[in-house]
Amino acid sequence: MGIDAGNTSSKVVIFDLYGKMIATAATPSMHFKRRGEGFEEFDVTELWNLISVCIKEAVEKAAVAPEQIAGVGVTSFGNGVVFLDKEGYAIAPGCFSQDYRANSIIEMYQREGTYEKINDIVKGTLFAGEPGPILRWYKENYREIYDQIGGILQFKDYIMYRLTNVFATDLNCFGGAFMVDMNTMDYSRELMDLYGIPELYDALPKLATEPTEIVGTVTKEASEITGLAEGTPVAAGMMDILACLVGAGATGEEVYTAVAGSWCINETHSDRIIPNASSNMPYLKKGEYLNCSYTGASGSNYEWFTRILGGTAKLEAQDRNLSQYAVLDELIEMVPIEKVKVFFSPFVAQPSIHMNAKANFFNIDMSTSYAEICYSVAEGVAFIHKHHIDFLRNAGLPVKEIRLTGGTAKSHVWNQIFANVLQVPIVGVDCEETGAQGVAIAAGIGAGVYKDYEDAFEKAVKVKEPVLLDDSTFPIYEKRYKEWCQLNEIMKTYWDEKSKG
């Protein structure tokens, strides 16, 4: 079983040993109404309750004895934070990774000269949605909550805690959340001092060194709630970034993974620390790093667009008995890209490229069609992925193939746009839930079902034919990408002014 708790939705999937999904269940990951600028929160206990219902539903749908489920793996959105008291109860809303209330803390670290010191230890680029800045923000603004904190977890770790009653995380997840000294691959009092939260060092969970490590087993109480068999092994798992890579089998040389889900994730692996990367987190092999460039600006823009501006497509979809996304794909596909004038900056969910960036449409006039606006959103998302992938390429990490995962990977239209914008073959996998598959594979290895990752990939990961490139579009996209970058550069002054109120 793989559990993938995302920013938008949470999924539970049961796979057979050959990667076939035999049962699934899902629930929206409900966001609270914003209590303040930059707040992106959720009810920790309620989301666990919803996921536990999904676990039970998946077990029942699978029509197999619970004892036949060899193991459970868990992943979730990385970063953000879950606060527990000393008794293990959630004492405040959890924070999603898009939460940026702690921008002021980042600015404070930069003024104090702390920012670069932290980045040097964690081997990444600290941003406001990481646990350290959020915890410091609570210390400065909600001391009554901060003083009760007895445990710090990522949400995937909270799910494991509710399943096993074991307070643990894994090296990849907490390394990616910048809570680990990447020089020692362990916790660091110096790092906690730099964050300004030294008193929380003892609130850090047990650190499993491998995603495949069995950290505990399903308790009697969790068994009664979820329908899983008591004693079922639960693996340490990994952050969703790595889980999607594993689920896509993208461990080969010069193979990138692009996750076009709520976040814009772009990653590969090497034996090098890449300066100024979003993160260089612990990878599957010692001595190698997961080199990442990412931002909270991908499929979340499309989700917003369909909710706020997708009414026309929704009505047509109802008339034709199609999905709203199928109608939008048709609209996008009919747009002649050489005539497109509209641009979209895809920063609805979180700032990217610039700390104060917001989403914008540019160049709309009376001749602009609804289809062109739809197209500009898809292209804008592809452009932000290009921005990050180019960073990794320019750092000396070559790419010959990109495995595209996430919600937008289900669309052949989006696959084609990505391939032509990036000028790299896009290869999909025959699994719509690669994050869940990635941690299911880890659990399978931990439980002894697979010998190792290579054995699991050979048996469980099915790769599709690559999307063919249309090189006639390359000059058009190169020109439009250059203009898109220029527009964002021009907007920086305005964004900064607006951020001051």
Language-model segments: which ranges?
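Carbohydrate-associated surface elements
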Residues: D99
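Gly-rich Lys/Arg/Thr-decorated short loops/hinges at beta-loop-alpha junctions or inter-strand turns
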Residues: S29-E41, K117-I118, D170-G175, E199-P205, ...
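Short beta-strand-loop/turn "lid" adjacent to the catalytic site in phosphate-handling enzymes
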Residues: E60-F96, T125-G129, M160-D181, L207-T212
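Active-site metal-coordination/substrate-binding segment of hydrolases
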Residues: I105
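N-terminal glycine/serine-rich phosphate-binding loop of ATP-dependent small-molecule kinases
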Residues: M1-P93, Q148, S223-E224, L228, ...
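Gly/Ser-rich phosphate-binding catalytic loop and adjacent alpha/beta segment
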Residues: A102
